[in-house]
Curated annotation (Swiss-Prot):
Alphabetical list of Pfam families matching this protein: ATP-synt_DE_N
Listed name of the protein: ATP synthase epsilon chain
Subunit structure: F-type ATPases have 2 components, CF(1) - the catalytic core - and CF(0) - the membrane proton channel. CF(1) has five subunits: alpha(3), beta(3), gamma(1), delta(1), epsilon(1). CF(0) has three main subunits: a, b and c.
Keyword Cell membrane in record: yes
Cited InterPro entries: ATP_synth_F1_dsu/esu, ATP_synth_F1_dsu/esu_N, ATPsynth_dsu/esu_N
Localization: Cell inner membrane
Membrane topology designation: Peripheral membrane protein
UniProt entry keywords in alphabetical sequence: ATP synthesis, Cell inner membrane, Cell membrane, CF(1), Hydrogen ion transport, Ion transport, Membrane, Transport
GO CC terms, sorted: plasma membrane; proton-transporting ATP synthase complex
Stated family: Belongs to the ATPase epsilon chain family.
Known role: Produces ATP from ADP in the presence of a proton gradient across the membrane.
Sequence intervals crossing the membrane: none
GO molecular function list: ATP binding; proton-transporting ATP synthase activity, rotational mechanism
Amino acid sequence: MDKLFLEIVTPEGEIFANDVKSVQVPGCEGEFGILPRHATLVTTLNAGVIEVINLDGTKDMIAIDDGGCIKVAEDKTTILANGAVYIGGSNESEIAISLQKAKELVKSMSSNTIVYATTIAKIDEQVRQK
């Protein structure tokens, strides 16, 4: 099975590090997807939601603020973000807390109202699916 190692890091530490099937990120020129053996690239990221498809088919989401960057190599992708919040948890209380933190992060860092509205809609959709 093809897999890609994804690492998401902030100044506070590592947010995510695992082998995944694919990842979709909010690039500076629009959203794009990354699969194993992707062409090498380095680019900046907008505020938004990173969607991760794990090896077992489950989906994780991480909200990031503006100004991050991504380095994609054939078998490893590294995302550096000023701020990031994992959206999820093992119970409704944890999910509600992470949802609120994600919304606050995106609201405080994005001056673009379209990016903000789109990101909040994606976050809300993920919570409804859990």
